[in-house]
């Protein structure tokens, strides 16, 4: 009846568990001998409390800029969007802001500027290229060809005496549309024969005087 009321007798616990040192297992037992039902369990090692807010602790602290610092950074950004390390160091000395934070500020400012401009429109027409300038040497042959076209047909060059001979044709009419003009007026009454006779007489008279 006692066994049915109180259950089966408890099994004997091992003297020394394999995973626990004997000193800690036997600590606090009655009489310091053997582990029995009255043996006090060893206190468990306390774990460190879980760190609350670990991601927020690892997050970098946000830098707050004053109005004067923002004005200085904006002036430099209007001048150059990609400052080098030397310019960032000078800005760090002037604004008392770490150089790494200045570099991050310029990265964010460039991204903001691209968002404000928006993507380029694909259908926007490109500006036409400027017209090519013609060199003066290229215009000279064109002007020369125009002058030759105006004087067409060109006048034929001949010996000086050809201007005195009339062109052949019916009724003594000139053959071309541009008859040559005589170099000097012809003497009336056959002046050529009279001049030749007078010259011969003068020459004969001078020869006889010798």
UniProtKB/Swiss-Prot annotation:
Main subcellular localisation: nucleus
Biased composition (Low complexity): 39-57
Record's subcellular location: Nucleus
Residue ranges the UniProt entry marks as DNA-binding: 58-117
InterPro entries per record: HD, Homeobox_CS, Homeodomain-like_sf
Keyword Iron-sulfur recorded: no
Compositional bias of kind Basic residues: 109-118
Signal peptide (from-to): none
Record's function text: Transcription factor that play a central role in proper axial mesendoderm morphogenesis and endoderm formation. Required for efficient differentiation of cells from the primitive streak stage to blood.
Protein name: Homeobox protein MIXL1
Organism per entry: Gallus gallus (Chicken)
């Amino acid at each position: 009846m006692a066994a049915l009321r109180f259950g089966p007798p408890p099994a004997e616990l091992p003297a020394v568990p394999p995973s626990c040192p004997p000193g800690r297992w036997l600590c606090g037992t009655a009489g310091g001998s053997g582990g029995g039902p009255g043996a006090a369990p060893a206190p468990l090692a306390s774990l460190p409390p879980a760190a609350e807010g670990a991601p927020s602790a690892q997050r970098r602290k946000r830098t707050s800029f004053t109005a004067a610092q923002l004005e200085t950074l904006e002036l430099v950004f209007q001048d150059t969007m990609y400052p080098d390390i030397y310019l960032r160091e000078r800005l760090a000395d002037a604004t008392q802001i770490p150089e790494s934070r200045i570099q991050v500020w310029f990265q964010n400012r460039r991204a903001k500027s691209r968002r404000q401009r928006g993507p380029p429109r694909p259908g926007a027409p490109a500006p036409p290229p400027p017209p090519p300038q013609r060199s003066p040497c290229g215009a000279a042959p064109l002007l020369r060809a125009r002058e030759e076209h105006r004087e067409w047909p060109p006048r034929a060059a001949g010996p000086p005496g050809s201007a005195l001979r009339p062109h052949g044709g019916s009724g003594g009419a000139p053959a071309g549309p541009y008859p040559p003009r005589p170099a000097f007026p012809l003497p009336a009454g056959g002046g050529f024969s009279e001049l030749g006779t007078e010259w011969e007489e003068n020459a004969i008279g001078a020869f006889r005087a010798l």
